[in-house]
Amino acid sequence: TTTAANIVVSGGNVADVAALITSGYASGMTTTMGNGVTLDGVSLNSYGGNIVIRGKSSTSVTTYTSSIGAVSNANGIRAHGNITVDTGAGKLSMWGYAQSSSGSSNGIELSTSASTYKSSSSAADAITMQGTAANNAAADAWGIYFWNSSSVLASNGGGISITGSGIKNSGVVIPSGSAVLSTGGPITITGSGYGAGFNAVDIAGHVGLKSGINTGASTSDITLVGNKFAL
């Protein structure tokens, strides 16, 4: 369909849609899928509706098969393969909470393959991502990890807010090859809770503007919040 409609990936009392959007979450399982939400080679298009994705991991890691083969994760939100999430003029909100005591347990971990998360909303909160890794016993506990092929794009002057807390590793990691871009809206990246030898915010990719991606010029104010950075 090309009709504007909201897409909500969450969990809880289905009779209370408002709670699914604000406080509900899909829960990971301890036997077959430890991730709260797994995006595996999927395209989500809401054509002007909002997209909300909320996931909370299981308390122990599981091994499962994805488009890239067998993996062991217990993340709040985990993406595999080529992902497209496009809200049109709607807003995008992603919330991931990871709590496993073993394996890789990150708040939000995006894909190693080329992926785009896009909104043409002009609102200051066009795109929001919040990821928390809460268990120091996990092998990996990053707040938000982009990998090197994911782009977040506010194409119509909308704002972007990315907030990550990594109890063992860095709060927010935007590695080389990844990008957080807006044509004019504010970009705020906040990191906290990092472990020894890591950073609140770690950026080697592009923030604001990247050559070759169709955003034109950018007039975005960029704010980094944290007390230890790698830039």
Regions found by a protein language model. Give the residues of each.
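Surface-exposed loop/turn motifs in large extracellular/passenger domains
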Residues: T1-L231
